[in-house]
Amino acid sequence: WIMGHMVNKKYQVDEFADLGANAIEFDVTFDSNYKADYTYHKVPCDCGRTCGRYEVFTEFLSYVKNETTPGHPSFREKLVLLQLDLKMSYLTESQSNEAGKDMAKKFLNYYWNRGSNGGRAYILLSIPSIDNYLFLTGFKQQLKTEGFEQYLDKVGVDFSGNEDLDSIVNVLGRLEDEHVWQSDGITNCWTRGISRLQDAIKRRDEDESRYGIKKVYTWTVDYYPSIRYYLRLGIDGVMTNFPNRVEYILNEEEFPGSLRMATIDDNPWEKYVG
């Protein structure tokens, strides 16, 4: 998965898709009532990017619905994954639960269109901390309450705060969620060691538990040598400000036999066996 980073404006969806992204990541903030309000990343953000651009969340969601709905004039076939970077680390457990319920309602109304020709992309909920795990519980509960449990097949979870992997695995067991991605990374302004990333990859490959890690990705990787390096480690996704660079490298002689861009037919909740 080539994951376009910080795609918080409508026009950037097209910009990053044109550069080769088959997934986009956007930031989501919450108001004082724990309801999703904007696609916004405050200062600081990645080097070389402009912080602070935003859209009203529901308007942005409607826009990407059109981009991922077959038959719509704006449909982009290659755009198959939406990742939400949830800016909610300050919320309590009960507040996280309420935020999850609100998010499910917004997806039903503005993305899935309550079953009437809505968007088809997979959804990855990136939760900043295991302390906010009840967000996922609230999200699932709301879908079930409203009779749209089938959409759970499209939704996965990622705990994105670089926390202890054993602690994350324990929470995943309590959540009983099989659609698990695991991230590791840092802003492109800095470098980061790879020991935790390698541990996540090892767990993905060796852990056969039902609620184990299925995919591993790293962020934010922009430079050609770094992209090649991480691909060689065996990651499933690269979050980047330059999707065209990842696409270019995937077509180099080293990788075409083992790696390719994911399509809608590739299940993001299953381990890849190359």
UniProtKB/Swiss-Prot annotation:
Mg(2+) binds at residues 25, 27, 85. Belongs to the arthropod phospholipase D family. Class II subfamily. Keywords: Cytolysis, Dermonecrotic toxin, Disulfide bond, Hemolysis, Lipid degradation, Lipid metabolism, Lyase, Magnesium, Metal-binding, Secreted, Toxin. The active site is at residues 5, 41. Signal peptide: none annotated. It catalyses: an N-(acyl)-sphingosylphosphocholine = an N-(acyl)-sphingosyl-1,3-cyclic phosphate + choline; an N-(acyl)-sphingosylphosphoethanolamine = an N-(acyl)-sphingosyl-1,3-cyclic phosphate + ethanolamine; a 1-acyl-sn-glycero-3-phosphocholine = a 1-acyl-sn-glycero-2,3-cyclic phosphate + choline; a 1-acyl-sn-glycero-3-phosphoethanolamine = a 1-acyl-sn-glycero-2,3-cyclic phosphate + ethanolamine. Gene3D superfamilies: Phosphatidylinositol (PI) phosphodiesterase. InterPro entries: PLC-like_Pdiesterase_TIM-brl (IPR017946). This is Dermonecrotic toxin LspiSicTox-betaIII2. GO terms for molecular function: lyase activity; metal ion binding; phosphoric diester hydrolase activity; toxin activity. GO terms for biological process: killing of cells of another organism; lipid catabolic process. The keyword Magnesium applies. The lineage of its organism: Eukaryota, Metazoa, Ecdysozoa, Arthropoda, Chelicerata. Its cofactor is Mg(2+). Its EC number is 4.6.1.-. Disulfide bonds join 45-51, 47-189. It is found in: Secreted. GO terms for cellular component: extracellular region. The keyword Nucleus does not apply.
